Swiss-Prot record:
Belongs to the UPF0758 family. A motif (JAMM motif) lies at residues 183-196. CDD domains: MPN_DUF2466. One of its GO terms (molecular function) is metal ion binding. It comes from Albidiferax ferrireducens (strain ATCC BAA-621 / DSM 15236 / T118). One of its GO terms (biological process) is proteolysis. Zn(2+) binds at residues 183, 185, 196. Keywords: Hydrolase, Metal-binding, Metalloprotease, Protease, Zinc. This is UPF0758 protein Rfer_3252.
């Protein structure tokens, strides 16, 4: 239904101003940001399509899963929504990036990674949306407080493309007591390969020589993360 056909107090913008953002659904909040639809497609329908958006190259049942998953949408993903021109795409990408940065800042300010879930959420924010495969390391102090997150390698990850010496040097630089290894799978699956397991064991053995523990190796994809420690693969 076009917004002009709704009662004034049911229109998203007016509803937000009168009752606050908590009174709006995810679709309505997106509609406020989009402002207008196009001929034949109202802004509420456009907002609904965004929330149901499938990631480029994904299977039919592998979508963004609502507003949380939409945080990982790229500009190319948004191009597939009819009527979403460059200006609106740029606004959305900027808002989504601000949201990711705000969430990442909140997580970093907590400083202590007390649970595997906290680590997975933090890494998802930083790695899940990347279009290429990256290998990153969380460097932690003796109280599991974050010292640094560094992306060390890019491309298909193997034992030969990830250099243990570089990981050791960065751990010494940060005076880390422990690390969490991480990489992303842009394909969407988080199942570890045999190469992932072998790489983990190589780094675990190498870092043990300088008394740095490998607490976990986390594999992330949009909307999903896997802890190899929780799977008993460490």
């Amino acid at each position: 239904m076009p917004l002009k056909d709704l009662p004034p107090d049911a229109r998203p913008r007016e509803k937000l101003l009168a009752r606050g953002p908590g009174a709006l659904s995810d679709v309505e909040l997106l509609a406020v940001l989009l402002r207008t639809g196009i001929k034949g497609k109202g802004v509420l329908q456009m907002a609904r399509e965004l929330l149901e958006l499938k990631k480029s190259g994904s299977d039919d049942n592998d979508g963004f899963d609502g507003i949380a998953g939409l945080l990982h949408a790229t500009s190319d993903d948004l191009k597939r929504i009819k009527g979403l021109g460059p200006a609106k795409r740029a606004e959305l990408v900027a808002v989504l990036e601000l949201s990711r940065r705000a969430l990442a800042q909140q997580l970093k300010e907590r400083t202590i990674f007390a649970t595997p879930d906290a680590v997975k959420h933090y890494l998802q924010l930083h790695l899940a949306a990347k279009p290429h495969e990256v290998f990153a390391v969380l460097f932690l102090d003796v109280q599991n407080r974050l010292l640094a997150l560094e992306e060390l390698f890019r491309g298909t990850l193997t034992q030969t493309s990830v250099y243990p010496r570089e990981v050791v040097l960065r751990a010494l630089h940060h005076q880390a007591s422990s690390v969490v290894l991480a990489h992303n799978h842009p394909s969407g699956t988080v199942q570890p390969s045999r190469a992932d397991e072998m790489l983990t064991q190589t780094l675990k053995t190498t870092l043990a020589l300088i008394d740095v523990r490998v607490l976990d190796h986390v594999i992330v994809a949009p909307g999903e993360a896997l802890s190899m420690a929780e799977r008993g693969l460490l």
